[in-house]
Regions:
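Conserved beta-strand/loop subsegment of P-loop NTPase cores
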Residues: 60-67, 84-98, 109-121
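Canonical P-loop GTPase G-domain recognition
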Residues: 97-139
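Conserved G1/Walker A P-loop phosphate-binding module
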Residues: 1-39, 44
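Switch II of P-loop NTPase G domains
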Residues: 36-82, 99
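Charged, alpha-helix-enriched surfaces in structured cytosolic catalytic cores
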Residues: 8, 12, 48, 100, ...
Length: 139
């Protein structure tokens, strides 16, 4: 399951790994694309939907918190990873942007309770070394 705010690159990541998420607008329903589960970004952005997010995560083996390196804030509250009884990984996207601050994004994910944090540039595609390492970690 890929969890993150709107625009962090969750759907692009799934597409880069060779699985096509459903086309169209981002719905307010959980989407399935191959082995990936994509809950709506609103589940993360609105605390009222945390129960739905936790319930959706019950069927998943691995959760991935996706943080955009260009954002100055994070939607992940401190210690949020401890809410789940699954393996939780962190993923920093958009590290090549001029406004990127991967150290800050790493601090956000560490604050959420993650130890395993990967940085990938989705635009490089599935053949990049970072993307291959991340794919090995989640599968």
């Amino acid at each position: 399951m890929l969890i993150g705010e709107k625009g962090v690159g969750r759907r692009s990541l799934v597409h880069a790994l060779g699985f096509a998420p459903p086309a169209g607008l981002c719905p307010l329903a959980v989407e399935y694309a191959g082995p990936f589960v994509l809950p709506p970004a609103e589940f993360m952005e609105n605390r009222r939907f945390y129960r739905a997010l936790i319930t959706s995560a019950m069927e998943c083996r691995t959760l991935v918190f996706v943080q955009d390196a260009t954002r100055a804030t994070s939607a992940f509250p401190p210690g949020f990873a401890r809410t789940f009884n699954q393996r939780v990984l962190g993923l920093i996207t958009k590290p090549d942007s001029p406004r990127a601050n991967t150290a800050r994004a790493g601090r956000f994910l560490a604050s959420a309770g993650l130890q395993a944090i990967h940085t990938v540039n989705i635009l490089e595609g599935a053949e990049s070394a970072a993307m291959k390492e991340f794919a090995r970690e989640i599968f």
